[in-house]
């Protein structure tokens, strides 16, 4: 991968920083693994805004990514190509299994076209192979981690993400996440070895507001710039600071307020994130 800074030929190009990967497939995606993706504009079935800052953007297809990797145990697969996916920050890899089926997976870092991958208890310890956490050596770096056996990967799926397996005790293993959190996960859950590809994603700069609009993201308006009817920070004569601690448009504390409410899984957290 290469980090490319654009020359300031226009105001919109001045701050553009691109991450260029020459290995990415330049053709169309694999059609049988595409699904229609409808735009909602952030509205529900009543037409009311349920998620702010969503609207517009380029038309996209959803790529069907295999997050489970549990029904092809022992069947080797060849990486046909690495592709761009507009629906996520990570790249995806198209696998051709020995039985003739093709599937997309999250592309692990260091995996390229022509590599052989396999899933299952007997899979060798190398990046891209998927197996149960109880079969992975302590100290290994993993991604695409399940929280419930068979449910599919839920942890460490975005660009550059990973976790480290630091202990194994009984039916649980302990993972250290990138956030600093340490948590227990059932040893029967699956994970993929290595870290997620496209770790340079955070180094890019879109350069202009329009590039954000191409991605379907609308502007975020500050509460202090609104009227009192629209936001608790709105109104006032001239410019104000809002007059109170930061809150959301509905009056809930924001900017640092704890939002985690899943007490059921608190017992699985060994150490809270930093």
From Swiss-Prot:
InterPro entries linked to this entry: NA-bd_OB-fold (IPR012340), Rib_uL2_dom2 (IPR014722), Ribosomal_uL2 (IPR002171), Ribosomal_uL2_bac/org-type (IPR005880), Ribosomal_uL2_C (IPR022669), Ribosomal_uL2_CS (IPR022671), Ribosomal_uL2_dom3 (IPR014726), Ribosomal_uL2_RNA-bd_dom (IPR022666)
Location of the region described as Disordered in the Swiss-Prot/TrEMBL record: 28-54, 224-274
GO CC, any one term: large ribosomal subunit
SUPFAM superfamilies membership: Nucleic acid-binding proteins, Translation proteins SH3-like domain
Positions with biased composition (Basic and acidic residues): 263-274
GO molecular function: rRNA binding; structural constituent of ribosome; transferase activity
Family: Belongs to the universal ribosomal protein uL2 family.
Protein name: Large ribosomal subunit protein uL2
Gene from which this protein is expressed: rplB
């Amino acid at each position: 991968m290469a980090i490319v800074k654009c020359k300031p030929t226009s105001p919109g190009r001045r701050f553009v920083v691109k991450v260029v990967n020459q290995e990415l497939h330049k053709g169309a995606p694999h059609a049988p693994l595409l699904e229609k993706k409808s735009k909602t504009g952030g509205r529900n079935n009543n037409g009311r805004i349920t998620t702010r800052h969503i609207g517009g953007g380029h038309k996209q297809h959803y790529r069907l990514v295999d997050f489970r990797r549990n029904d092809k145990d022992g069947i080797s697969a060849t990486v046909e190509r690495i592709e761009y996916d507009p629906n996520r920050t990570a790249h995806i890899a198209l696998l051709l299994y020995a039985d003739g089926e093709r599937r997309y997976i999250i592309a692990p870092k260091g995996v390229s076209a022509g590599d052989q991958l396999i899933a299952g208890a007997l899979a060798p310890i190398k990046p891209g192979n998927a197996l149960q956490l109880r079969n992975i050596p302590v100290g290994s770096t993993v991604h695409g981690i399940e929280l419930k056996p068979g449910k599919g990967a839920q942890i460490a799926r975005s660009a550059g993400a990973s976790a480290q397996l630091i202990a194994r005790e009984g039916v649980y293993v302990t993972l250290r996440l990138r956030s600093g959190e340490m948590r227990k996960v059932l040893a029967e859950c699956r994970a993929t070895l290595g870290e997620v590809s496209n770790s340079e994603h955070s180094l890019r700069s879109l350069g202009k507001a329009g590039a954000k609009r191409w991605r379907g993201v609308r502007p975020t308006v500050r509460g202090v710039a609104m009227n009192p009817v629209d936001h608790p920070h709105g109104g006032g004569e001239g410019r104000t600071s809002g007059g109170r601690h930061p809150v959301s448009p509905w009056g809930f504390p924001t900017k640092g307020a704890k939002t985690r409410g899943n007490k059921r899984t608190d017992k699985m957290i060994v150490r809270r994130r930093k």
